Curated annotation (Swiss-Prot):
Gene Ontology process terms (BP): cell division; cell wall organization; peptidoglycan biosynthetic process; regulation of cell shape
Reaction equations catalysed: UDP-N-acetyl-alpha-D-muramate + L-alanine + ATP = UDP-N-acetyl-alpha-D-muramoyl-L-alanine + ADP + phosphate + H(+)
EC number: 6.3.2.8
Pathway: Cell wall biogenesis; peptidoglycan biosynthesis
Summary of the function given for this chain in its UniProt record: Cell wall formation.
Classification of source organism: Bacteria, Pseudomonadati, Elusimicrobiota, Endomicrobiia, Endomicrobiales
Ribonucleoprotein is among the record's keywords: no
Molecular function GO terms recorded: ATP binding; UDP-N-acetylmuramate-L-alanine ligase activity
Chief location: cytoplasm
Cross-referenced InterPro entries: Mur-like_cat_sf, Mur_ligase_C, Mur_ligase_C_dom_sf, Mur_ligase_cen, Mur_ligase_N, MurCDEF_pg_biosynth, UDP-N-AcMur_Ala_ligase_MurC
Protein name from the UniProt record: UDP-N-acetylmuramate--L-alanine ligase
GO CC entries: cytoplasm
Length: 450
C-alpha cells in the first residue's frame, strides 16, 4: 500500500460510501480529516475514532492534506477541490482509495441494484464469525459490529461495490455476488444493455480460480448467464438453483427456511430480519461462506443472530400503540419488497408510508413504476424530492409520483405538516419512513409527537 502516515482529507466524509473508507484508513495509522455540510452521528463517530472533522466546506480545511478524496456527489466547484487543484494536491475518487485498500487483499465484492448493504453485512459477519477476520467496508451501519467498517488481519476484504457510476469495474474480486440487475442509474448507463454489459465485465474480471455467486431469480441475471466465462454458482427461491431456500415460513418474530446446496439439504436457518428478499440475501452470504470453507453450522448461527443494518427495515420505536419503521428503499422494486415484508409480519395493522423520492433523474425515469409499487400501503404521504446534489429538472416534482399513485387507486396525498399528519394516526398503525434521503428524521420527530 502507499506510504504510511499520510494526511488524507475526505470531502463529504459523512457519506455512506466515504465514512467506512475513512475509518479503515484511521485504523491503518493514517491522519484523516474530512468535511461535511452538517454534524451527524456519522461525523461524530469518526471524530471519536480519530478523524479531524470540519463542518462546512472551506479551502482552509485542506491545509495539511496530502491527498483529497471525493465522491461523485462533490462538485468540481467545491472550494476544497478548487484549493487542492491550486496547491497541486492529488484529488482522487473514493473508488480509487477503495481499490488501494483492496489491492493487497482477496476481495469479495457485493454488487446488484438492490440488497447490497444487507448482503454485504451478512457476508462480512459470516466471514468474521467464521474466523477469517476480514476487512469490511459497507454502505450502512452493521448493528452486530456497531460500525460500517473494520480493519481485519485476515486475507479478505468484503466490499459493497457501487454500480451506479461504473466504478465497481475498477475492483478485482476473487468472489463477486450479483444480487439482481434492475433499471436504475440509466442516467449514467443510457440503456439496460449497457448496464448488463457492465455486470458481465465485472463478473468476467475475476480470476480463473474465482467464483461469481448470482441470483437466478432475477430475470436480467438469467439473461447474462450465457456471457459469463468464469465459474458461477446460482442461488434463489425459485426453480433449481445451486443454493436454494425451501419451506420458507414467515412468522411474527422470525423467518425460517431450509437450505439446499447442490440439491442436498445442508441445514436450516431461523433469522430475525424481515422479508423474503432477505432470505435471498442470506443465500448469497451462505454461498460465499461455503465457497470459503466455513461450516454451514457457523454460517447459520451467524444469520440467526444477525440484527440487521441501520435504515433497512429498522424498527425505530413503538409508542401509544403505534410503530415507526425506517427503510432506505428508493427504487420501485425495493419499495414493493419492503411493503410486502411489513404486511407479511403485521397483516392486521394499517400501513402508513411517508415516502421521500430520491433524485430528480430517478423520479423522471420511474414515476410510473413508483405508482404501481405501493399496492401494500394503506395510505401514502409523498414528500418533496431529495435532490442528492442533483440540479432540478423542469416539470419533475414529487407530484409525478403522487399522480401516478392516485391513478393506480392508491390512497395518497402530498405531505405538508408532521403534527397534522400525526393527528390522523390511530392505535395499531405502522408508520414507515421510506427513502434514501433524510426522511428518517420525520420518524424520530413523530415518535416524540405521538
Amino acid at each position: 500500500m502507499f506510504l504510511k502516515n499520510q494526511n488524507i482529507h475526505f470531502v463529504g466524509i459523512g457519506g455512506s460510501g466515504m465514512s467506512g473508507i475513512a475509518e479503515v484508513l484511521i485504523n491503518l495509522g493514517h491522519r484523516v480529516s474530512g468535511s461535511d455540510l452538517k454534524k451527524t452521528d456519522v461525523t461524530e463517530y469518526l471524530k471519536a475514532v480519530g478523524a479531524k472533522i470540519y463542518i462546512g466546506h472551506s479551502c482552509k480545511n485542506i491545509k495539511s492534506a496530502e491527498v483529497v478524496v471525493t465522491s461523485t456527489a462533490i462538485s468540481r466547484n467545491n472550494p476544497e477541490v478548487v484549493a487542492a487543484l491550486k496547491k497541486r494536491i492529488p484529488i482522487i475518487a473514493r473508488i480509487e482509495m477503495l481499490v488501494e485498500l483492496a489491492r493487497l487483499k482477496y476481495a469479495v465484492t457485493i454488487t446488484g441494484t438492490h440488497g447490497k448493504t444487507t448482503t454485504t453485512s451478512l457476508t462480512s459477519l459470516v466471514l468474521h464469525n467464521g474466523g477469517l477476520d476480514p476487512t469490511i467496508v459497507i454502505g450502512g451501519r452493521l448493528k452486530n459490529l456497531k460500525t460500517n467498517a473494520k480493519l481485519g488481519r485476515g486475507d479478505y476484504i468484503v466490499v459493497e461495490a457501487d454500480e451506479s457510476d461504473g466504478s465497481f469495474l475498477r475492483l478485482s474480486p476473487i468472489i463477486t455476488v450479483v444480487t439482481n440487475i434492475d433499471n436504475d442509474h440509466l442516467d449514467y448507463y443510457d440503456s439496460m444493455e449497457n448496464l448488463k454489459e457492465a455486470f458481465v465485465k465485472h463478473i468476467n474480471c475475476i480470476p480463473f480460480y474465482g467464483t461469481a455467486i448470482i441470483c437466478s431469480d432475477n430475470e436480467v441475471v438469467r439473461k447474462i448467464i450465457p456471457q459469463i466465462t468464469r465459474r458461477y454458482i446460482t442461488y434463489g427461491l425459485m426453480g433449481n438453483p445451486d443454493i436454494k431456500a425451501s419451506n420458507i415460513k414467515v412468522l411474527k418474530n422470525h423467518t425460517s427456511f431450509d437450505v439446499f446446496y447442490m440439491r442436498k439439504k445442508v441445514g436450516s436457518v431461523c433469522m430475525k430480519i424481515l422479508g423474503k428478499h432477505n432470505v435471498s440475501n442470506s443465500l448469497a452470504a451462505i454461498g460465499v461462506g461455503l465457497r470459503l470453507g466455513i461450516s454451514f453450522s457457523s454460517i447459520a448461527d451467524t444469520i440467526n443472530k444477525f440484527d440487521g443494518v441501520s435504515r433497512r427495515l429498522e424498527i425505530k420505536g413503538e409508542k401509544n400503540g403505534m410503530m415507526v419503521i425506517d427503510d432506505y428503499g428508493h427504487h420501485p422494486t425495493e419499495v414493493a419488497a419492503t411493503l410486502r415484508a411489513i404486511k407479511l409480519f403485521w397483516p392486521e395493522r394499517r400501513l402508513v408510508v411517508l415516502f421521500q423520492p430520491h433524485r430528480y433523474t430517478r423520479t423522471k425515469q420511474l414515476f410510473n413504476e413508483f405508482g404501481r409499487s405501493f399496492s401494500d400501503a394503506d395510505f401514502v404521504k409523498v414528500l418533496d424530492i431529495y435532490s442528492a446534489g442533483e440540479q432540478p429538472i423542469d416539470e419533475v416534482t414529487s407530484d409525478l409520483i403522487l399522480e401516478s399513485l392516485v391513478s393506480n387507486k392508491c390512497k395518497a396525498e402530498k405531505f405538508s405538516d408532521l403534527e397534522e399528519f400525526s393527528k390522523g394516526l390511530s392505535v395499531g398503525d405502522v408508520v414507515l419512513t421510506l427513502g434514501a434521503g433524510d426522511v428518517w428524521k420525520k420518524g424520530e420527530e413523530l415518535l416524540a409527537l405521538i
